[in-house]
C-alpha cells in the first residue's frame, strides 16, 4: 500500500515553526497548487513559506523528506476500481521547480501494486499522476495530480496511449487496457527559439492562430 510522509498544512509562521519542530530537517515547503522547495534550516523554511504564500496563498504544506528514488506513475482509472493503463517513469532530470524534465520508463512491482490499490479503494475515474519516493518495496506518495502530466505523450510514444484510451472509455468503446511497454525508453524535454515578426506574434495573441 501507499505510505504517506508526515505532512502538515500551515497557515501562519507560528504554525510553520511548530510543524518544523515536529518534522525535523530536511523537509519540503510546498504550495497547494505548485512549487516545492527542499530546505535545511528554519530561515530557509520561513523564506519559502512567505514566497509560496504570496504566490499561491494559504495553506502552505510542510512535508518530511523521504530517502529513495523519485518515481512517477501516469494512468487512467475506469471509475470502477480498474485501470485503463499505466506507465512508470523514473525522473532523470528536473526543472528549477522540481518538475520532471527527463525520465526513463521503469517497471516497479510494488509501485504498480500500490497504484492499483489506490484506484480500487478510491474508485478513481479519469487521469492521474502519482509522484512517489520508492525505497525498496516501500512506496511513499508525495503528490497526486488528478490530470495528465505535461509529459503524457511519453506514455503514448512507448505504446500506452492514455488520452486515446480515456476518450474511447468515455464513448463506451472497447479499450485495450494492457500496460506493456519497453523498460529503458527515455525522454528529454528541450526548448528552442522561434524567430517571427511582432505583427505575427500579436495576431497569435489576439486571434489564437497564425495568419
Predicted segments with their positions:
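A long amphipathic alpha-helix within ATP-dependent nucleotide-binding catalytic cores
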Residues: 55-56, 98-141, 145-147
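Short beta-strand scaffold segments in enzyme catalytic cores
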Residues: 72-75
